[in-house]
Every structure is written in C-alpha cells, then in structure tokens.
Amino acid sequence: MPEHLNARVEACYRQAEDFFQRTFPRPTVSFRLRGQKAGVAHLDENLLRFNPQLYRENREHFLEQTVAHEVAHLIAHQLFGPRIRPHGEEWQLIMRGIYGLPPDRCHTYAVKRRTATRYLYRCHCPEHNDFPFSAQRHNLVAKGRRYYCRRCKATLVFSGEVTRD
C-alpha cells in the first residue's frame, strides 16, 4: 500500500523541483491518521500523515488529489515561510500551476463513523435517571472516579446495560 503513495509523493516533489529549479527536503510519510481527515501536513516537522482507510476506499483520487494537496502545503511553507495562509494564494498557485489540479480545500470521501459504545449509568431520580457514558468515562469510573446526579446528588451507578450507536 505505501509504495504507490510514496511514489506519488516523490513525483510531486520532482514536479515542484523542475518548476522551481531547486531541491526540497523529502518529508517523512506516515499512515497514522484516523477520523475524517484524509491527510495532514506538519510543516515544522516536514511530515505528511495520511489516513489509510480513506486511501484504500478512494485510491485513485487520493493519489491524484490528496497527496498533491498535502505536498503543496510543505512546498509552499518551504518557499514562502510560515506566515502564509494554509489554503492561501501561494498554495493555490502550486496546486494549479505545478500539479494542474483544482485547489480544493476539503475532500468529499464518504467517512464511516465508528459505532460508539455507551454504558448506561443511573441515579434515583424518577424522571432523569439514564446517563450514557462513553468507554473513556466508564473506564475512569472503574479506576475510582465518581460522577453525581445534579438533581438528587446521588452517585451514578452502572446499570450493566451497554448500547451501541
């Protein structure tokens, strides 16, 4: 999987070097990105992070557009410095002039939401007694943290029920 993406990063750098007649330091490329973002350029670290799930699901467009988008951020930063806007004029010129691509700010990939597990906690209030806790909050309770109902001031207790959104 990474060999095609790394080859595209290299191709984008060569295009920029041919255009600007100078060399650019190559970034570290990582596939450690999750969630909604397809890619992120860390300017000061010269690091590109890509979302492997979105890459697998949208491979052709991802290689063409997303990789160039993130490389353009690093090139713009190295050419024009840290004071430029992330999707400003300089970045747009690189996207259009070097890569011949539309300077789209955001992707339109379908992002699958992961299912959230909720742990139901209860108090003694008759009308206000269900409190769905996240896994993180549930684990904090297991480590001794206490949560209280704002109405009756009783400690919330795990009911044993688990739901999935």
From Swiss-Prot:
Domain SprT-like residue range list: 10-157
Q: Name one GO molecular function term.
A: zinc ion binding
Sorted UniProt keywords? Cytoplasm, Metal-binding, Zinc
Task: Please name the GO terms of the biological process aspect recorded for this protein, alphabetically.
Answer: response to stress
Q: Which GO terms describe its cellular component?
A: cytoplasm
Ranges in a coiled coil: none
The family this protein is said to belong to: Belongs to the SprT family.
The UniProt entry, under HAMAP family, shows:
SprT
Its recorded name reads: Protein SprT
Gene name, per UniProt, is sprT
